[in-house]
Swiss-Prot record:
Protein name: Putative zinc metalloprotease spr0242
Keywords for the protein's UniProt record, in alphabetical order: Cell membrane, Hydrolase, Membrane, Metal-binding, Metalloprotease, Protease, Transmembrane, Transmembrane helix, Zinc
Coiled-coil ranges per UniProt: none
Classification via Pfam families: Peptidase_M50
Organism: Streptococcus pneumoniae (strain ATCC BAA-255 / R6)
Topology term for the membrane: Multi-pass membrane protein
Amino acid sequence: MLGILTFILVFGIIVVVHEFGHFYFAKKSGILVREFAIGMGPKIFAHIGKDGTAYTIRILPLGGYVRMAGWGDDTTEIKTGTPVSLTLADDGKVKRINLSGKKLDQTALPMQVTQFDFEDKLFIKGLVLEEEKTFAVDHDATVVEADGTEVRIAPLDVQYQNATIWGKLITNFAGPMNNFILGVVVFWVLIFMQGGVRDVDTNQFHIMPQGALAKVGVPETAQITKIGSHEVSNWESLIQAVETETKDKTAPTLDVTISEKGSDKQVTVTPEDSQGRYLLGVQPGVKSDFLSMFVGGFTTAADSALRILSALKNLIFQPDLNKLGGPVAIFKASSDAAKNGIENILYFLAMISINIGIFNLIPIPALDGGKIVLNILEAIRRKPLKQEIETYVTLAGVVIMVVLMIAVTWNDIMRLFFR
């Protein structure tokens, strides 16, 4: 149960933060956000803000989404003959079109729709008591959809397609950008919880109380300057020295040179065997000043992003489904993190957020990266691609993503449960 809750919480936070990036910059770019939803499925709460956005909470706590006017297939479709009820404003214009069948307004006018245009000419036409009538529709009118969600109509001037090229580009980039920001913030929280940021650039290490070095009397304040014949100047050189000195050896002993108060001495240590790796019982030192901790959030996030990019590069040149993880693998990892405490959950949250940010920047049309490529092409050509071409390109991207997701999920299930 804890694993399920952790998965829902981590995935939910990441998706909502991602979608909020699209939401915020869409509004700044003059694009109408028709709905900002937390969760999926049937709605359990809805509120229309003064900004015209419907804020909804939906029953399945799995992420969320934004509906931008003119983005994708977000259009209002009314079939000929559909019964609706119209609420009129004082000036005679329609301010609400109710498609839900529920009675929301005692004075609403029933109509069977024969024609409508909510994008350009803003009118609705149909039969009212067997008489055909046409009504002008207010620019900020709302539509009550079949499930009861009330959203603004989407006239052309507030649609995604009519934003500036830079407005569209930043709107598409903002989702992944928020994922990177979330990663940095969570790493900050971790660093402050741990009392500082790891200092891997010095040979002043933290000697663990029950470790191999502590058992031979090495004090916490000592510096490790040499292991065997290998100089030690930082954390990486210590790791390499231990691995080199213990390679192909059983129960090895190490000659460790330490420096304390200006004098050097050598101690002989028997490292602890941990599943084939030999440990001295040391950790990197910690920088606890505010500036180091602040910068540490950025550097830790950057290091994580570089590792993910390196793994992605290897995957491109050496494709292997076993190197990919879908929802099942993420659930398994979240369950493992939940068993090991809040710090592991936070680390998992930061890493997955950065991972999703990078993944979304891959130039596949269905992803934000693909949309950004289309924005760049539009900027170069000084005109957008034809809507039909953009639709087909996006559809191809969706097909690729669906096939990949099915393959990865199937591979996850087979790998985790049947091997």
